[in-house]
Amino acid sequence: MKLKNVIILLVASLSFGSCKTDTFADYVDAENEAVDKYFKDINAVIVHEKPETVSGEWLDSNKRKIFYRTSSGLYYHQVSLGDTTAAKPKVSATVYFRYLAKDLKDQKIYSAMEENSPNPVKLFLTGSSSDLYGEGFQESLMYLNKGGKCEAVVSFKIGNKYNSSLEGGYTSKDLKYLPMLYDIRLVNVE
């Protein structure tokens, strides 16, 4: 009987010992690969200086989307400029916005667009990653003008604070380390 228990414990310990535990570096590497693949798949151009302000979408001469990579690691693409005469969002402003959150494979995670929500989302900008809408998401809002639209790729390191997925079937652990693609429209700034 004792030999049987020893064998069971030995098999169990070998099973647990063979379980892979992902490190933070593993998540960073996986994210970098996913982001690189996403931009390659959509044939986007990445720049490190903010493009000159234009009224429409940031596109290069070959009609490829231009994404501005900020120092924080946010990838920001202007879809439309919006009202340049209106107040610009900044830390301590209250903003109203609509957004769609997706993974980099275009799987919807959450939507606060008109068809899903009667009112825009209201947020007091803190600039902090402690908020549900992390630092990268808030940074995206601060680049927008009232009525403007953008696409933003936000690293898990500067953004994703979702605890659960309303759509897409992700677990909270999956979401914690998932780079997100946001379509954002700024409705108003107070």
Region spans (language model):
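Sec-dependent bacterial lipoprotein signal peptides
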Residues: 1-19
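Cross-family detector of peptidyl-prolyl cis-trans isomerase
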Residues: 19-190
